[in-house]
Structure formats: structure tokens, C-alpha cells
From Swiss-Prot:
The protein's name: Probable inner membrane protein BTH_II0599
Disruption phenotype: Disruption confers resistance to cellular contact-dependent growth inhibition (CDI) CdiA-2 of B.pseudomallei strain 1026b, but not to endogenous CdiA. Unchanged binding to B.pseudomallei strain 1026b inhibitor cells.
Summary of the function given for this chain in its UniProt record: (Microbial infection) Probably transports the toxic C-terminal region of CdiA-2 from B.pseudomallei strain 1026b across the inner membrane to the cytoplasm, where CdiA has a toxic effect. Expression in E.coli makes the bacteria sensitive to the tRNase domain of B.pseudomallei strain 1026b CdiA-2.
Membrane disposition: Multi-pass membrane protein
Length: 270
């Protein structure tokens, strides 16, 4: 495993590579995303622990998305079952480590939203973990305290995202123990913070541009009432492309995970 340091403009390359990868097999990636959403919804219905189960499974599912990207580049068929690739293809030790990462992710997210309670007294925490959120009125979501809590959560989530950005795939594909994987992930994200900043701004600009563009178009057509109906599939496509770009960031920061693995195109010159 080699940790690669890249320039800020590489963030644009990752952005383009994510879109290119999605275009290789758009139907498969949209299907994967829908399958993921459905699975997480069903898992969350489990009594008592349902709110935490999706977080527990996220690291393993992340490996599945990465495997789907790898197989798409290799020209292999991608089926929804690849989402559980992390739990079935690398042995019981890797499965245990991925679940350990999931447990650490639960603790990290609980800490983030617990701190957000300083802003709104725990409203956001209740919503995210299903702790009596059904009793909250609409006024609670519109209060200044709730907005402050959201800002606190967003700020604290940044280091959590850095820890878990590469940790699952490092654990599954490089046999790195969970704690070391979290450390290497943070180091890689920090060393390439310029590229990640450009990368994040580009995705934010795309999402914002599509949202405003579709809203303006629907208003011009006199169909504003249907704007949300049009925006939902657009949001799904953008999110699926974003997920594809995660693989590009991994390859950009750590190179090829195995001998003979297919290469991503360098889209910087296109």
C-alpha cells in the first residue's frame, strides 16, 4: 500500500472520473443505490436497534460500492448482491473488522449529534436516532437552535468523514486493522486536503446548479408544482455519480489495490 500525495487540481480529475465511471453502467449504479436505500430502510425497522443498524453496516456496504466500481471498470457484470461483497468475499476476519468499524462509526456519530444538542437541546439527536422524533412539531425544525445544531453537527462530522473515507476499503483490500485504517485514512485526507476541497466544491456546485436549474426550468414552464418530482431522480443520479467518485479518490490516494487491476482514465486532458 502506497499513500500518494496529489495536487489540488487532482480533485477535478476525481470529479470527472466519477462521472465517467457512472456513465459506464448507469443502470447498474442506480439499481445499486435503490437497493442500498431499500435495504437500509428495512434494517432501520428492526425494533430497538433499528436506528443504529444502518450505521453498523455502512463500512461493509462501502466496500461493496467500491467493488462495483472496480468490476465496472473491468467490464464485469455488476449485480445488487455486490453490496455485501465486503462481508462475504474476504473472510471472517475482514467481516469482523468491518463490523468493528461500523461500531466505531456508531460511537462517532452518536458523539457528533450529542454535541449538537448544545445548540437545540437534543432535537437533532432525537431525529437522527429515532428517539421520540415523532413527537416533535414543525416549529422545532424551524427554530434557530436547530439550525445551530445542524452547523455544529456538520463541523464535527468533517473529521469523522476523514476517518472513515478510506478505512473500510483499507481494511478489506489491504488487510489493515481498523484503528490503523482510520489513522491512514485521516493522514491521506489531510495530505490531500487541497484536492478534496476542490473535489467537494465541484460536487456541491453541481448539486446546487442542477437544483436551481431544474427549479427555474419548471417555473418557466409553469409546472413548479412538479419540481420536486423532477428533482428527485436528478438527485439520485448525482448521488450515484458521487459514490462512483469515491473509488476515484481511493485510486488517486492509494493507487492500484492489486496487480493487474484496470486503470481509470486520466480525464484531466479531456
Amino acid at each position: 500500500m502506497q499513500l500518494i500525495e496529489v495536487s489540488a487540481k487532482t480533485g477535478y480529475v476525481w470529479f470527472r472520473q466519477g462521472i465517467w465511471l457512472f456513465r459506464r453502467n448507469p443502470l447498474a449504479f442506480v439499481t445499486l443505490f435503490f437497493t442500498y436505500l431499500l435495504a437500509m430502510m428495512l434494517v432501520s425497522l428492526v425494533p430497538v436497534i433499528g436506528a443504529a443498524l444502518p450505521l453498523l453496516l455502512i463500512p461493509g456496504i462501502a466496500v461493496g460500492f467500491m467493488a462495483a466500481c472496480r468490476d465496472t471498470i473491468a467490464g464485469k457484470q455488476v449485480l445488487p448482491t455486490i453490496l455485501i461483497d465486503g462481508f462475504r468475499s474476504y473472510g471472517p476476519i475482514v467481516t469482523q473488522r468491518l463490523l468493528t468499524l461500523g461500531g466505531l462509526y456508531i460511537v462517532s456519530m452518536a458523539a457528533v449529534f450529542a454535541c449538537s444538542a448544545l445548540g437545540d437541546g437534543g432535537t437533532l439527536l432525537k431525529i437522527m436516532f429515532g428517539l421520540g422524533a415523532e413527537n416533535l412539531g414543525p416549529d422545532a425544525l424551524e427554530s434557530p437552535g436547530f439550525k445551530i445544531a445542524a452547523l455544529i453537527a456538520a463541523a464535527l462530522y468533517a473529521p469523522v468523514a476523514m476517518m472513515f473515507w478510506f478505512a473500510p476499503v483499507l481494511t478489506a483490500w489491504h488487510d489493515v486493522p481498523p484503528v490503523k485504517a482510520l489513522f491512514f485514512s485521516v493522514v491521506s485526507c489531510w495530505r490531500n486536503k487541497g484536492a478534496f476541497t476542490v473535489y467537494g466544491l465541484l460536487w456541491f456546485a453541481l448539486a446546487l446548479g442542477v437544483s436551481f436549474g431544474l427549479a427555474a426550468l419548471m417555473q418557466a414552464l409553469g409546472a413548479s408544482a412538479y419540481a420536486l418530482m423532477v428533482m428527485m431522480p436528478a438527485s439520485i443520479v448525482i448521488t450515484a455519480m458521487l459514490y462512483c467518485s469515491f473509488y476515484a479518490t481511493y485510486r488517486g490516494c492509494f493507487g492500484v489495490q492489486e496487480p493487474g487491476a484496470p486503470k481509470l482514465p486520466n480525464t484531466s486532458d479531456r
